[in-house]
Amino acid sequence: MSLLKMEYNLYAELKKMTCGQTISLFNEDGDFVEVEPGSSFKFLIPKGFYSSPCVKTSLVFETLTTTDNKITSINPTNAPKLYPLQRKVVSEVVSNMRKMIELKRPLYITLHLACGFGKTITTCYLMTTHGRKTIICVPNKMLIHQWKTQVEAVGLEHKISIDGVSSLLKELKTQSPDVLIVVSRHLTNDAFCKYINKHYDLFILDESHTYNLMNNTAVTRFLAYYPPMMCYFLTATPRPANRIYCNSIINIAKLSDLKKTIYIVDSFFEPYSTDNIRNMVKRLDGPSNKYHIYTEKLLSVDEPRNQLILDTLVEEFKSGTINRILVITKLREHMVFFYKRLLDLFGAEVVFIGDAQNRRTPDMVKSIKELNRFIFVSTLFYSGTGLDIPSLDSLFICSAVINNMQIEQLLGRVCRETELLDRTVYVFPNTSIKEIKYMIGNFVQRIISLSVDKLGFKQESYQKHQESEPASVPTSSREERVLNRIFNSQNR
C-alpha cells in the first residue's frame, strides 16, 4: 500500500484519468472521502494505478517470483481454441506483462473487449498460460455457471461459492482449489480477503463496469487493502473512474461479418387511458419517478403498444425471418405479461422465461442453447449483462429508459459470432399514453443512435405490420399517422 500526499501533479493525473469526475479514496485514517487538492491527509493510492508506465513513480512492486501459488491441474491439451483476434489479445497481454515485470510494475490489465468477443474463454486461456491460482469474482449468481462451464472445459480444479462466505472459509481450511469462483459480496468478509490475498495470485473481476469504485464498496476496499498480485478487469463498457484501480488497458477492435439491422416499428396510436394510467400519470413529475419507475410502469400497461410488440414478434417468428428471440422488459410484471401471452400462442416447448427469482433459470438457459427455435422473455436486470446464449439472432426491446452502458451490453447479447450472420433488433418509439409520448421517443432514439453510431447497426423502418392494417381507418387518423412517421424520421 502506498500512502501519499495529494500533490498537484498526482491530483491532476487522477482527475484527467477520471474525465473530471469526483475522486474518492481511503485516507490514512481509513475513511473513504472525496479527494481535494492540497489536502493535509495522505491517501491510499491503489496499486493498479501504477500499472501504466505513463505514471511516473519510484515505487517498486513485488513480482510473481515471491509467491508459490501455482496451479497443479493444468493439462496443455485442454487449452481452449481461440479465434485469431482472441489470440491477438493473448499476445498483447503476454507482451505487456513482460514489460511490466521488467519495469517492476503491478500486473494489472483491463481487457476492454466488445460484447460477444469471447472474454470468458480468452481469459480462461490466459489463466492456463499464467498457471497461477485464480479467484474469479462475478457481480451476481447468474454469471457463476457461465464461468464454471468454461473452467470445467479447460480441466482446471475449481470450486464455486454462491452461499455464505463463512461456510466457504471452513471448507478452505482443508482444501484450496486452483480456481475459486465467487460472488463479489464475499469480499465484505475481511478474513476471506486476507485468505485469498495470501493463497491466490490472480484476481479476475468480471463485468467490472458494474462496480463504481468511486463508492465505498466491498470491491473497492478489497482492491485498496488486499491488492492481488495479478489482476484483470473484464468489460465491454469500462467506467473511466475505475482506471485508477487498473490503469493498463488492452482494447482490440473487433471486425465482424455480422449483418446487423435495427428496425424502428412506428405506429400511430389513438390516445389510451384508464383509471390506473391516470393515477400513475400524476406521479410522473414527483420524486417517486426519479428513476423513471412510473414511466416504465405506464409502458407496461400500454395495451395498444404491447399489442403492436406482440403482433410484430408473432409475424416475424411465424414467417421464419427470426428464430431465436430475446424479449427484454424493464419490469418483472411486464415480463410476465409477455411470457403468458406468448405461452398461449406458442406453448412451453418454444417460450421460456428468464426469471431471476427462479433458481432453475440457469439450468433452463443451458437447455435452450441447442434449440433451433425459441422465445426467451426476460428483464434488463437478468439478461442485460452476461446472458450466455450465443445463438440469439433477434432482440425485442420493450422498455425505453436504458442508459448507454446498458444499451451496449444488451445489444451485445445478439452480436455473438456464429455461422449465421443476420442479427435483428426491434424498437418501439411510440406510445398511446400522450403524457409520455415525447419522453419515450427521445429515450428510444438514444438506443437507435448508439446502435448505429457505435455498434454498426443499419437503421431501417419496419413496414410489414403497418401495411396490413385495415383500410377502414378514418382518413384523419391515416393522415395523422403519416405526419407522425414524417416527424419521427426527421428526429433521427
Swiss-Prot record:
Ordered alphabetically, the record's keywords are: ATP-binding, DNA-binding, Helicase, Hydrolase, Late protein, Nucleotide-binding, Phosphoprotein, Transcription, Transcription regulation, Transcription termination, Virion
Report the principal subcellular site: virion
Query: Record keywords: DNA-binding included?
Result: yes
- List the InterPro entries: Helicase/UvrB_N (IPR006935), Helicase_ATP-bd (IPR014001), Helicase_Restrict-Modif_Enz (IPR050742), P-loop_NTPase (IPR027417)
- The chain positions of domain Helicase ATP-binding read 100-256
- In short, the EC number is 3.6.4.-
Residue positions annotated to bind ATP are L113, A114, C115, G116, F117, G118, K119, T120
**Pfam families, sorted:** ResIII
Which compartment or compartments is the protein found in?
A: Virion
Q: Where is this motif: DEAH box?
A: 206-209
Function of this protein? DNA helicase which seems to act as a postreplicative transcription termination factor. Involved in ATP-dependent release of nascent RNA. Forms a stable complex with single-stranded DNA, and to a lesser extent RNA.
Subunit structure of this chain's protein: Interacts with OPG087. Might be part of a transcription complex composed at least of OPG087, OPG110, and OPG145.
Instruction: Name the family.
Output: Belongs to the helicase family. Poxviruses subfamily.
Q: Kindly provide the name given to this protein in its UniProt entry.
A: Transcript termination protein OPG145
Q: Which organism is it from?
A: Monkeypox virus
